Structures are given as structure tokens and as C-alpha cells.
A protein has these predicted regions:
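Active-site-adjacent betaalpha module
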Residues: 177-180, 185-187
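Domain-core and long-helix interface of multi-subunit machines
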Residues: 61-62, 69-166, 173, 179-180
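Aromatic-rich peripheral "rim/lid" segments of glycoside hydrolase catalytic domains that contact
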Residues: 188-193
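Accessory recognition modules or surfaces
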Residues: 155-156, 163-165, 185, 207-212
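An N-terminally biased module of ancient metal coordination in phosphate/nucleic-acid-related enzymes
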Residues: 1-56, 62, 66, 106, ...
Length: 213
């Protein structure tokens, strides 16, 4: 992953493996061992962390706080394998509950349609609590068949533009070839005329400051 990031000219790469709530993914021992990994490989600075799972309507996540000091970056999202969608109100409160968690830096793929939510209070909460929303490229890939993802992400971008809330673009690369792949996002950025200054991907120091690094 670091080699691919270097080849593409990236200065900073975040790697966040799924937390244990998803069957077959990393155990807590994996996260305990992250301290052995160099934080600069092939000239690329690494942020190593976890993609935590929101598991209930309160926004509870599936990894204990004792692990948080071991994680450079902590993102949280709703995943169908460990979250039972409720009403729009319940799902919205679940996501906002995670946004309110001071240990969470980013909400992953909030617009992928796994659970129907109300985006305006989510965007406002992200602004209030200094939590980034991810615009996820993989969710927009037609092969994923996320039928509401395009409209959802357009809504998020329009609201973030309206309220001047920064976002992070995520490739959601599960293989090195997809690192820094944002092809499905670019069309949405153009359609919404989204301000470049609200995209933190190419602002390394601003991003690191945002997440407290």
C-alpha cells in the first residue's frame, strides 16, 4: 500500500482496517501491534488506525477506548454486517452519536445507503463536533449497486458547501491499485461546484491539525 501511494505521489496515507464487529476481520491483537510499524515507508507518512463499526442507535462503537491511544486515526461507520437499520430518526441518531464521540475523526461513507438517514442534522453535527464526513469513491462505483449513493453524496456535498463544512475524499482502497482513486467522486464535485478549499486531501498539515496529529 505504501509503495503504491509513493508511486502516485502521495505524502500521507491512512490505513484503517475494519474493527472486530465485522466477521473475519482484524482481532484486537492486530491493533495492539500497530506500534511496530514504521510511520514512514517509501517516503510516505502513514496514519494507521481502525474503521470502527457503529453497532446501535446510540452510536456505540465496537472497540474499547483502551485501544484508542494505539490508533493514529479513528473512523466510524455503519456496516450491514453489524448494524440493523431502524427508522430514519434512529439511524440518524446512531450516526450523530458517533460524531459526538470525541475520539472519532471521520465518519466513513455516510452516504452509501446502508441505513437511511437525514443528512442535514448529520452535517451540522459534524461541523459542531469537528468530525469529518467522508465522500467515498467505492460507494459510487456502479458494480457496488449502492442505488442511493449518488443522490446521497450529492446531498452531503451540497449541505457541506452551504454550511462550509470540510470533507475528506476516500478511495476505500481494499487493494493497492485503488489508492487515490476518486474517479466517481469528481463528477459530483463538478456538479455541485464544491469549493476546493473544503477538501482536505491535498492539505496535509491542515488535515493533520484537524485530527489532532
Amino acid at each position: 500500500m505504501a509503495a503504491a501511494a509513493s508511486e502516485k505521489g502521495l505524502k500521507l496515507l491512512g490505513i484503517t482496517e475494519h474493527a472486530p464487529g465485522i466477521p473475519g476481520t482484524c482481532s484486537p491483537i492486530y491493533f495492539r501491534n500497530l506500534h511496530v510499524v514504521p510511520r514512514r515507508i517509501y517516503g510516505v507518512e502513514l496514519l494507521l488506525g481502525a474503521e470502527l463499526n457503529i453497532i446501535d442507535y446510540k452510536g456505540t462503537i465496537d472497540l474499547g477506548e483502551e485501544y484508542f491511544p494505539m490508533l493514529d486515526i479513528r473512523i466510524a461507520g455503519i456496516h450491514s454486517l453489524c448494524y440493523k437499520p431502524g427508522t430514519v430518526e434512529q439511524n440518524t441518531e446512531a450516526m450523530i452519536g458517533a460524531i459526538r464521540n470525541p475520539h472519532i475523526h471521520i465518519i466513513s461513507h455516510p452516504g452509501d445507503g446502508t441505513a437511511e438517514v437525514d443528512f442535514e442534522p448529520i452535517v451540522l453535527a459534524s461541523k459542531e463536533h469537528h468530525t469529518l464526513l467522508e465522500i467515498n469513491n467505492s460507494s459510487l462505483n456502479p458494480v457496488r449497486k449502492k442505488l442511493t449513493a449518488r443522490d446521497n453524496n450529492l446531498t452531503i456535498l451540497r449541505l457541506c458547501k452551504k454550511y462550509e463544512v470540510p470533507v475528506i475524499l476516500g478511495s476505500d482502497a481494499h487493494i493497492s491499485f485503488d489508492i487515490a482513486r476518486y474517479d466517481h467522486i469528481y463528477e459530483l464535485l463538478q456538479e455541485t461546484r464544491f469549493p476546493e478549499e473544503l477538501i482536505l486531501n491535498d492539505k496535509v498539515e491542515a488535515f493533520k491539525k484537524f485530527i489532532g496529529r
